Each structure stands twice: as C-alpha cells, then as structure tokens.
C-alpha cells in the first residue's frame, strides 16, 4: 500500500563524513543515497514548501518524541522500560501544552488569525491551530523587497484587517521593512520565537506559550 509517493528525482547522494552516517541506508538498493524531500512529512501536514519547523505543532513534537524513544530503545534495549516511562510522562506534558495552546488560539478574533511575519516558518503552527499565513518578508541582507511586494503586503494587512505584524526573535533588529509597514498601517508589532530559546523562554513549552500569548496580546484578546 502506497502511503506517500516519493518521486525518484528526490534521491540524492549522502555527503561523505561521519556527520552524515545516520542518513545512509543499509538497504543495498539505495546504499549511500537518501530521499531528500521538500519538507518533513508527518501525518497530514504536507504544504509543498520547505518548512523544517515541525516543532511549532505539538502533535509533531509528540511524533518526534516517539521516534526518539524507538531509536533509544533500539540502541539500548535494556533501557526500554525507562524510555517508555519517560515518554509517557512527556506525552502527558505535551497533551497539556496542546490543550493550553488550543484554548488561546481558539479565542482569537478572525482577523487575528492572519499572520504577517518576517519568517516563513510558522506553517505548522498555522495548520495545527487554525491560523493563516497571510504574508511574510524575510529579513535578508541580500536585498530589500520591491515596492510592488511592499504594496501587496500592505494591501493584505489592510484588506484582512490584520491587527499586528510579527518579527522573528532572532532577526528582529534586521526587519526595518515590516517595522515601517506596521507603522504606516498603524498596527502593532510583536516578536515570535522561531528556532531560538532565551532566558524568557528557555524550554520548548515556554517558547510555544510565549508565541501564543504574544499573538493573543497583539490581537487584543485575553490569553488567560
């Protein structure tokens, strides 16, 4: 039974070196090669775009924990019971986190569900929690967006009545375009965590909750 059809053109050579050893298949058919997909495929999350930020969906995090448990059990069978116990504990914590997030995002006004950001890394967040990626402008040193791109993004903000524009935590200081756009459109700016942690959000759950509370605060909704 075919679950996901993977085209042969995605088969790529695995780079030499020990750092990539884990990618090498033991099967003789594709030894030294690996299927390089556009994004991680977990369950129904198939967006057709490059988005490695699977952790922005708690169900994806749960799937990752199970993969880690299985890998540890395979490498260390004597610890199987301990890995299973710890996994069960983590799963309960993730279920509680997921419930909190759904409560916060579920209370958002419709317009606040449209995200305009500096980082196209929130598609799993959007698909899991009922949000929509309305637009983004990457904070890149390689060049500024064109006038047409800026005008199009501003129309998006105005037409959808987007209450805020979100900057990425790691590139907030390099996001003058969106900061200026927010000022012109007279909407708020918020800062979201993408792939970093800090003293305010040193752990996964705190990072996820911080993003949810930021979006709720910028929308004018109470995050509890």
Predicted features along the sequence, with ranges:
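Extracytoplasmic metal-acquisition and chelation regions
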Residues: 1-224
């Amino acid at each position: 039974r075919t679950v996901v059809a993977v085209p042969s053109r995605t088969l790529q050579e695995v780079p030499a070196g020990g750092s990539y050893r884990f990618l090498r298949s033991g099967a003789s058919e594709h030894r030294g090669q690996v299927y390089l997909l556009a994004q991680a495929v977990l369950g129904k999350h198939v967006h057709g775009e490059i988005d490695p930020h699977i952790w922005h969906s708690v169900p994806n995090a749960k799937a990752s924990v199970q993969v880690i448990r299985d890998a540890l059990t395979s490498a260390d069978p004597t610890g199987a019971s301990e890995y299973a116990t710890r996994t069960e504990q983590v799963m309960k914590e993730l279920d509680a986190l997921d419930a909190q997030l759904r409560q916060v995002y579920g209370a958002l006004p419709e317009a606040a569900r449209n995200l305009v950001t500096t980082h196209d890394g929130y598609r799993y967040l959007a698909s899991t929690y009922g949000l929509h990626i309305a637009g983004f402008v990457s904070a890149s040193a390689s060049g500024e967006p064109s006038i047409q791109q800026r005008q199009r993004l501003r129309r998006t903000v105005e037409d959808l009545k987007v209450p805020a524009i979100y900057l990425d935590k790691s590139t907030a200081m390099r996001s003058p375009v969106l900061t200026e756009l927010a000022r012109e459109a007279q909407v708020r700016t918020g800062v979201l965590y993408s792939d970093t942690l800090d003293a305010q959000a040193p752990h996964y759950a705190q990072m996820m909750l911080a993003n949810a509370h930021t979006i709720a605060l910028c929308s004018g909704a109470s995050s509890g």
